[in-house]
Amino acid sequence: MERDVMEYDVLVVGAGPAGLSTAIKFAQLNKKNNTNHSICVIEKGSEVGAHILSGNVFEPTALNELIPDWKDKEAPLDTPVKKDIVKYLVNENISIPVPLPGFFMPNFNNHGNYIMSLANFCRWLAKEAESLGVEIFAGFTASEIIIENDQLKGIVTGEMGVSKDGEKKPSYQPSMELRAKYTVLSEGCRGHLGKQIIKKFNLDQDKDPQHYGIGFKEIWDIKPKLHKEGTVMHTAGWPAKGCLLYTSPSPRDMS
């Protein structure tokens, strides 16, 4: 099957924090070395951030290194953590406060961290990437990898405008090849392209299987008098193994 082909120097699959940070770093190196390598990011969501549902307690060390002037550029890190709380839940009515020994549990110390929407952060990263010359294409899925001479040469996008019955709609667009000298897969946990790479090169041979945990996210509306901006709480005990709670700037803006 003949397909249209677009070629880049760097192709990043997935516009999450890792993929966008990768594209930004490549673009910064372009500027530093006075080069003009083409960089493309594709994202399956209708827009950057569309598939990023999580809030986040964000540790900014990596961002300080990548974009030192992020405050001047108005990165959406506007809720600094003000208080950490650790509690053991006995049941639905009783909890026991646990002193916070930062030396023994440094991950429970969020001083200097920020509460934020990860989707908004990705949108901000996308704007930064585009300002550096990165091309970002949202709404494009990557259906398969292109392997030639045992090297990853790019990806094939999925067809667009196909009905549930497999019929081509008036908006149909055929798949195309995106080829690059360097292809970076940033599609997240258990991505289907990653599975293809693992199978092709037997990367899991004689390896222990990966382990995964299931987490559930809930957004709670609480009474304004109970809302304490910048609070992070870790729990253990009832009803399962524990949870992480944090307050947004207001009860409804952690989209």
Across the structure, where does each feature detected by a protein language model lie?
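Flavin-dependent oxidoreductases
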Residues: 199-200, 214-245
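Conserved N-terminal/central alpha/beta ligand/cofactor-binding core
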Residues: 3-5, 35-164, 174-182, 192-195, ...
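Glycine-rich, N-terminal phosphate-binding loop of Rossmann-like dinucleotide-binding domains
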Residues: 15, 187-188
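N-terminal Rossmann-like FAD-binding beta1-loop-alpha1 element of flavoenzymes
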Residues: 10-35
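Secondary-structure boundary motif
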Residues: 28-32, 131, 253
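Active-site catalytic pocket residues across diverse enzymes, especially alpha/beta-hydrolases
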Residues: 29-30, 197, 201
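Extracytoplasmic/periplasm-facing segments of secreted or lipoprotein envelope proteins
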Residues: 170
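Single conserved hydrophobic/aromatic residue that forms the stacking wall/gate
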Residues: 246, 251-255
